Swiss-Prot record:
Gene: fluC
Topological relation to the membrane, as annotated: Multi-pass membrane protein
Listed name of the protein: Fluoride-specific ion channel FluC
Highest taxon, organism lineage: Bacteria
Gene Ontology molecular functions: fluoride channel activity; metal ion binding
Pfam families reported for this sequence: CRCB
Role according to the record: Fluoride-specific ion channel. Important for reducing fluoride concentration in the cell, thus reducing its toxicity.
Regulation: Na(+) is not transported, but it plays an essential structural role and its presence is essential for fluoride channel function.
HAMAP family to which the protein is assigned, alphabetical: FluC
Length: 130
């Protein structure tokens, strides 16, 4: 039996638990901001650093595919998908695909925000949860 899905699921459970823990440990006041999503901000930045580090090691075959699936797809995927976004963008830039990288960054942020707004609107107006 192929355990790839189990490795990803186990890593995802660990990453999600870590995300929850970090989010609970962070204060809501940050610098000059009265209310700032510091937990989410922190996991996104930490995740980007870790996936950059691990992504480089993966290209050098420092660890096997199963560990990569467990840690990168599972743990970091559960911790933050923003780290994958950062790695994908870096890979485009490294290949001098600047238009693609800019389109990816702008498109992800703009369409992501639009998606959140539409989802919010639909839940508020059609599901009856105000």
């Amino acid at each position: 039996m192929n355990f790839v899905f189990l490795w990803a699921a186990l890593g995802g459970a660990i990453g999600s638990s870590l995300r929850y823990f970090v989010g609970k440990m962070m204060p809501s006041k940050f610098l000059m901001f009265e209310s700032f999503p510091l937990g989410t901000f922190s996991v996104n930045i930490i995740g980007c650093f870790v996936i950059g580090f691990m992504g480089h090691l993966a290209t050098k075959k420092v660890f096997g595919d199963d560990f990569g699936i467990f840690f990168v797809t599972g743990v970091l995927g559960g911790f933050t998908t923003f780290s994958s976004y950062g790695l994908d963008t870096l890979k485009l830039l490294q290949k001098s695909q600047y238009i693609e990288a800019i389109s990816y960054v702008l498109g992800t942020n703009l369409l992501g925000l639009i998606g959140v707004a539409i989802g919010w609107f639909l839940a508020k107006n059609f599901v009856g949860v105000h």
